[in-house]
Amino acid sequence: MDTKGSTVTISSSTPPQNCSGNTNFRTNSSSNKSCCHDGQSTGCALQTPQGQGCGSSPCLYRCPHYLIRTYSFHPCLDDGSRCTEGINTHEKETMQILNERLANYLEKVRMLEGENADLEDKIQEACSKALPILCPDYLSYYTTIEELQQKILCTKAENSRLVSQIDNTKLAADDLRANYEAELSLRQLVEADANGLKQILDALTLSKADLEARVQSLTEELLCLKTNHEEEVNSLQCQLGDRINIEVTAAPSVDLNQILQEMRCRYESIMETNRKDVEEWFNTQMEELNQQVVSSSQQQQCCQKDIIELRRTISALEIELQAQHRMRESQECILTETEARYTALLAQIQSLIHNLEAQVADIRSALQRQSQEYEVLLDIKSRLECEIATYRSLLESLDGRLPCNPCATKWEPSCQARAMECFTPVYTSSSLPGIHKPCRASGPPSRILVKICTITKEIKDGKVISSYEHVQPCYITRATKV
């Protein structure tokens, strides 16, 4: 008789190891589940009541959960040979199923080991490829940079030497220009003085010509007066002639030549005195003018010297200002080049950091994924080991419980049972009430169908990506006891 789609509770008479008490599990079974999915081993999902569980000292391994979907018992013949043969057949089937699952598990373990080896090779290859990017060789660039820096320093020294030579040449040219301007100004002053003296000489020449003209006019007037006087005397003498003979006692006659000579001498002395006065006045005026010219020339020379000094100072300051401007421009160029270089270097370092962060994030995600897969596989491995240990213990317990002379017992299965979970292999036995009859030579064996439902869920970032369910049937044949 088979009972399907029911909730079954199995009560165990054998206490579990390292547990404080029985643990009840409640689950629903359905008869339309498939028996297997490509031989994959997964865990199972059960609900545990509150307040019950294992003790403070848990076992090393956690056994899988078992769900008895359907059970039935088949009456055997009365002879013990048929019962033993049926038990051995079911044990062989169970061991064959376990061997198949173990082979699938080992094959999957080998496949995962190969995948892990491939992943390790890929990681090592990626690390070896990433090494040149992380640690580039800059030695050749350093030598080139040092050579270029030496050339730049030599060029800067040559430029500074040329700039100093240019500055010295400019200063010498400024000095020569200042001297030329001073000499030119002196020449202009001398030319102005010469022009003034020429004007004075022209004025004196004109005054001399005027005086000579006056002397000549006076001489001519004197001659005219003399001739007129002689003519008058002659005319008077002619008129008087012999008629009048007058004897006059008078002073001796005056010598006109002497008088003229005296007048000439007097006028010459007057002219000489006038000339001397004019020469003295001219000399005094010339001396005053010369003194003024000398003083003005001295002042002009002092002013020119001051102007030259100021011009030299201005030129020196302009040269220094230009040098400071050039230095500032060179420093600004160096600053811009340094900023550009360090900006590019910073951008490269930031890109390298971003790449490394991306690689680290990828490696972390890969490690997390592999750790999750490893945990899942380790859980599967532990579950499989627990299943194998459980099957072995069940087989050993069944072999130890088989009686030599089994008794025939008529019993009816109950729909209430109790399941137990612990960290050690689970021992289950059916203590089902029934109507006992007198013991016979052999009891009817019971065949129980146990279905192991295992569910594997792949979780990433707290979300279920995929879920797999595996159902493994297992038959357990028992003989009833008296």
From Swiss-Prot:
Site positions per UniProt: Stutter: 340
Stored SUPFAM superfamilies: Intermediate filament protein, coiled coil region
Region of interest called Coil 1A, as start-end residue ranges on this chain: 92-126
Molecular-function GO terms, alphabetical: structural molecule activity
Any one of the GO CC terms: intermediate filament
Segments of this protein annotated with the region Coil 2: 255-398
Keyword list, A-Z: Coiled coil, Intermediate filament, Keratin
UniProt-annotated stretches for the region Tail: 399-482
Role played: May play a role in late hair differentiation.
Family, as annotated: Belongs to the intermediate filament family.
Protein name (record): Keratin, type I cytoskeletal 39
Underlying gene: Krt39
